[in-house]
Amino acid sequence: MAADQRPLAIAVMGPTASGKTALAIEAAQRWGGEIVSVDSALVYRGLDIGAAKPDAAMRAAVPHHLLDLRDPWQVYSAAEFAADARTAMAQIVARGKIPILAGGTGLYFRAALEGLAQMPEADPAVRLAIAAEAEQVGWGALHAQLARIDPVAAARIHATDRQRIQRALEVYRISGKPISYWQTRPAGPRAPVRVLKLVLAPRQRAVLHARIAMRLDVMLADGFLTEVEQLRALPQMRAVAAPLDLPAVRAVGYRQAWEYLDGAGSLAEFRDKAVQATRQLAKRQLTWLRGELDARWFDPERDRGQLEQAVAGFLGQRRTMQQPSAV
């Protein structure tokens, strides 16, 4: 079998608040890389403090890609991300740099590196019709409707997961086929790069929980609630009938802040809900990461030496690949 000659890339993965951004910037500066954000919140303009978006100084130090692609009242799909990420990786390689993918959105990683099964594109009119129906009968009734037309998908989708219920019904209404049918079709072509997957995750769950709480407190001190108030004040957001259904507002922390500013509970209760929601997100991320059997796991504090050795060993292949073969 011929050697894999695809350009090399690094994927910095891990649960939220594990230190992915700092490691990605450090690796990019050391090895000559550019960062491709793999985060479903960072694609939205205005989601800065609460999404821990790299600031101007970080972006000046290292080029970042796939930030601020959409306004918060818009939708951005995993298929769009896959196309944009592959374009960004190809451009980075063409400049002689190393793509460093960094983030915590598992579906985006899978879309960019493995491809997605082809399925019907989103139809705004169909989505609006489904949302209007949900206003009348409730999302529970729509989940029951999904169970009748696609029991396989309904078994995987929780009755409160509005976004996935809406997408599954949308696909069926557009194509006449259940989303589970489309998901079994062949995925797209493999990624244009060969990737070293690094997972940053503290060995002690209590350490991660402490980091989550501390980061939220820093965000609050930096003006997170003011940021959400500014989002709420945008005319386009005020025109949305159900803003809590927008992907941007469903981002962890933002939904809880939005509900708090709607008058739901005290500031202390908001903080507790946001911390708990972030812990739950981290748990889901870790569950997904355990399925990445080719990933290498490192504690961000204890395993720095081993992590650096892993990166150096992997990127050492790049020099070998670039050398001309002997005649």
UniProtKB/Swiss-Prot annotation:
It is an enzyme of class 2 (transferase). The keyword Nucleotide-binding applies. It catalyses: adenosine(37) in tRNA + dimethylallyl diphosphate = N(6)-dimethylallyladenosine(37) in tRNA + diphosphate. One of its GO terms (biological process) is tRNA modification. The record marks 105, 127 as: Interaction with substrate tRNA. Substrate binds at residues 16-21. Residues 39-42, 163-167 are annotated as: Interaction with substrate tRNA. It comes from the Bacteria. Keywords: ATP-binding, Magnesium, Nucleotide-binding, Transferase, tRNA processing. Its EC number is 2.5.1.75. ATP binds at residues 14-21. Its cofactor is Mg(2+). GO terms for molecular function: ATP binding; tRNA dimethylallyltransferase activity. Coiled coil: none annotated. Pfam families: IPPT. Monomer. Catalyzes the transfer of a dimethylallyl group onto the adenine at position 37 in tRNAs that read codons beginning with uridine, leading to the formation of N6-(dimethylallyl)adenosine (i(6)A). Belongs to the IPP transferase family. This is tRNA dimethylallyltransferase. It comes from Xanthomonas campestris pv. campestris (strain ATCC 33913 / DSM 3586 / NCPPB 528 / LMG 568 / P 25). The gene is miaA.
